[in-house]
Regions:
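Conserved ABC transporter NBD signature motif
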Residues: 60-68, 80, 112-114, 119
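Conserved ABC ATPase signature
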Residues: 131-135, 139
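Catalytic Walker B motif of ABC-type/P-loop ATPase nucleotide-binding domains
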Residues: 156-160
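Helix-to-loop junction immediately C-terminal to a conserved catalytic motif
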Residues: 52
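ABC ATPase C-loop
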Residues: 148-149
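The feature captures the beta-strand-to-loop junction immediately N-terminal to the Walker
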Residues: 37-39
Length: 240
């Protein structure tokens, strides 16, 4: 078996004296979609930020494409081919959709050009001249994904893409993520909506209070709603 594209081992991260992550380990293979699930405050976003170098871990290791990148600054991690779609869809609100994409575009080029992003996200093409601050929540999520793609990553970390969006828009966002997966881009997907994420992922992890409490096939977990309730303490009877 080949080494994973991303390998996180025994990661511990603190904010001041407060320990957030406790020996978190996970992996993402080349072209694989992996779901990282858990309730608010479980440590999902901190895990992503620790991988990206935005919140350096206090111990443990992060390896990407065989290279240890633990604690590297975020810009160096991005240059290696790691994209990020953050919670809250941060972007330049006073710049147009096109200008946001141009700022994020990889100067070295690659298969994901702005033209290709517009082909896969035709709504963005229609809105290329509109300022990002005037886009709807769903349109901003699509722009955030587009910004990550034009950097031509091998791996994208996607944080809560369904948050605050109407069901039809969520469906469209997940259609786009499915296309990315089919194109060979690896995805680490953080999501509170467990069943939604499990539909697209091959494997799933569950975090609880900064500790990893589950790892296994996504389809297996999706078929056991009692197990999801036990792991996440949530009612999934109508979810997904």
């Amino acid at each position: 078996m080949s080494d994973p594209l991303l390998a996180v081992e025994k990661l511990c991260t603190s904010y001041g004296k407060i320990r957030i992550l406790r020996d978190v380990s996970l992996s993402v293979g080349e072209g694989e979609c992996v779901a990282l699930l858990g309730l608010n405050g479980a440590g999902k976003t901190t895990t992503m930020r620790s991988i990206l170098g935005l919140t350096p871990p206090t111990s443990g290791t992060v390896r990407y494409a065989g290279r240890e990148i633990t604690g590297w600054p975020a810009y160096k991690v991005a240059r290696l081919g790691v994209g990020y779609v953050p919670e809250g869809r941060r972007m330049f609100r006073d710049l147009s959709t096109l200008e946001n994409l141009q700022l994020a575009e990889n100067a070295r080029g690659g298969t994901w050009t702005i033209a290709r992003v517009f082909e896969h996200l035709p709504k963005l093409a229609e809105l290329r001249a509109r300022k990002a601050g005037r886009l709807s929540g769903g349109e901003q999520e699509m722009l955030a994904i587009g910004r990550a793609l034009v950097a031509n990553p091998r791996l994208i970390l996607v944080d809560e893409p369904s948050q605050g969006l109407a069901p039809l828009i969520v469906e469209e966002v997940y259609r786009i993520l499915g296309e990315l997966k089919a194109s060979g881009v690896a995805i680490l997907l953080v999501e509170q909506n467990a069943l939604l994420a499990l539909k697209i992922a091959e494997r799933a992890y569950v975090l609880d209070s900064g500790r990893m409490v589950h790892e296994g096939p996504a389809a297996e977990l999706a078929g056991d709603r009692d197990r999801i309730r036990t792991l996440m303490g949530m009612d999934v009877s109508t979810t997904g």
